[in-house]
Design a protein with these regions (language model features):
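PRY/SPRY (B30.2) beta-sandwich protein-interaction domains
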Residues: 1-187
């Protein structure tokens, strides 16, 4: 899985990339949960974080520094403020993340269907990130930046992968990236 699988079984965990998303670009990646009991207290958050590395003493780069989708509720979380947004995420769903650093928006795609955009920071660093809330349920989450639409051969997906690439023909995605958004990987 190349450090793209996060297994958590403890209170408040997180994972983020070592690379930021530069201003002036449009980026796409996918996330799936292959194991998770799910409850409001265990909410998986998917999105981008403003920290340059997680604060592992204080909620692993928590929602107060992130723009994310709160998976259990389907709410958007803008720097710790929640509001209505989309559909709750369940095990086996594929969530596409489209970050637009030109127009400063983020949009989440639930099994290929967009949930609408909301604004993100127009300056500073943003890092792809996932975080698991305060419960103790086991969670297995995989990230696909264009390297493998099967998420390392995970079972439980619906099997309808598009094996899609971005507009430059780069990447292997489960769902088709939105036009103009590029893989966060090289060919």
């Amino acid at each position: 899985e190349g450090n793209l699988k996060a297994t958590t079984n403890d209170n408040i965990e997180g994972m983020m990339t070592t690379f930021g998303l530069p201003l002036g670009g449009k980026y796409y990646w996918e996330v799936t949960q292959t194991g998770w009991a799910g409850s409001n207290g265990d909410d998986l958050r998917i999105g981008v974080n403003t920290l340059t590395q997680p604060d592992f003493q204080n909620n692993r780069g928590g929602s107060d520094t992130a723009y994310s989708l709160a998976s259990y509720s389907g709410k958007k979380d803008i720097l710790g403020t929640y509001s209505a947004y989309g559909t709750p995420v369940r095990t086996g769903d594929v969530i596409g993340v489209a970050v637009d650093r030109v127009n400063h928006t983020i949009q989440f795609y639930h099994n290929g269907s967009g949930d609408g955009t909301f604004s993100i920071a127009s300056t500073g660093d943003l890092f792809p990130w996932i975080g698991v809330g305060g419960g103790f349920n086991n969670s297995i989450t995989l990230m696909n930046f264009g390297q493998d639409s099967s998420f390392a051969g995970q079972s439980g997906l619906d099997g309808s992968s598009a094996n899609a690439s971005d507009d430059n023909g780069i990447g292997d995605f489960y769902d088709t990236p939105p036009s103009g958004f590029l893989a966060v990987c090289s060919s």
